[in-house]
């Protein structure tokens, strides 16, 4: 399965059907990977004095945005880099450089980074900022968002929480880093339509380079072939708010398969993700046939708005397909008439212009089981140009058609927010049910469905990250430092827990955020969210695996965490 996914993901990434990459980032002729990385010093992963202990090391993989590989907390006291490899997916391709096997961008290995750091120490270049510019990671002349230039970015905070060590801390040497900088368009697209292929390719890069790093250690230490099998922890602080949440997406299935099957010449591979930040955002709901629910679309939204409907698990697809009824404000409703998978329906305004469409997207779960799904895409409520069609803002009504198969159907509104630092005129829509209470009589937030009372069709439970529905990925939630109380924004799993592990993120419920490292050494920022909990969990898990702890599955990791007093939260 890994081999098939490798071919598929890299082919899709090379074809770049979504236009994620600038044209000059594409590698026109990827080369076959050879053994030269074990013999050519210029292709080395780490200097000899930065190699981890083969018996007590654990590789930390990070997939994020604008990871500052030159940061002092990713170096040793002698100045050597702990970053074995980093792939900047959208950088301008450099023929003849490291990473000729990759479909795009550039790869910098430890040997490359050490050269840049040595030049900075010698005064040949001004410092870390110059390293990013001269290496091709940051190019202000290109038509992309220069997120690496931001003083305090998401990737910097995540990377240092997961793998940052003081240069004089000997523990850092046993945690080499393999990182991937996702293209800015992937980070900007909060709906996640562009991310699966990029993330899948990133996972495969980390696994491939982790295997090569182990072979590199064997060669440099003169150890038997196949004897070094370092474990790997991969942190993915990304997520979606709409999806099946049952582990059936390609990305979730792949992470589960890798967690179970691993790689024959590596130790265990574990994935850590945030639980999510949208418990109180009113993006998750339920409906039965014949019921309807409000869906509020704000004005001045120049992006499309998405919502997904998912039915229960069934033994085969029913003859009477799932149908939905959509009613825009001020217009008549329309009901789909799906008869076969992958069909779509269009909704038009009185002038005949398209304002929404619905796709019938059933998903095969294996063993003859299916889940019916419908994805709804509504046009922007504010067009870029006057001649373009647009959807009316206000309260839409969505219903499960009365003749649909009897069951409870799950609704998920897709995230549609402006990511800090990115210019995108998005506005978040939400579900509306009069029974849903934001505050109680005393003005306090209502944080659980039990506190809410009644039977609202907008829910707080089950609001977890839609990437984290697999059986083996680990979900990290956030608590505040003062009371160790689950953060109000922290999403809930299906069992209403805040995650498999909870980490301190906010200083108090009235003081959100924690101090995190910025892009430059010594700089800092203030960040909040479960994206800051996940790297703390990744760091802890990497330390446990390096110490030889056996954690075969999610329950074992939970048990280990609960047995240790030094566990975050």
Give short role names for the model-derived ranges:
Residues 2-62, 66-79, 137-151, 380-389, ...:
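N-terminal domain-start motif of subtilase-like serine proteases
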Residues 13-17, 47-58, 73-78, 82, ...:
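Mature extracellular/periplasmic domains of secretome proteins
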Residues 22-28, 181-182, 203-248, 274, ...:
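Short acidic, glycine-rich surface-loop motifs adjacent to enzyme active sites
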Residues 46-201, 317-322, 469-472, 483-485, ...:
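Subtilisin-like serine protease catalytic core
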Residues 64, 276, 529:
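Active-site glycine-centered loops adjacent to acidic/histidine catalytic or metal-binding residues
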Residues 65-156, 169-172, 338-394, 401-435, ...:
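Active-site core segment of subtilase-fold serine proteases
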Residues 88-92, 114, 120-123, 282-372, ...:
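Extracellular S/T/G-rich loop segment that most often corresponds to the catalytic His/Ser-adjacent loop
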Residues 159-162, 167, 180-185, 209-213, ...:
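Hydrolase catalytic cores
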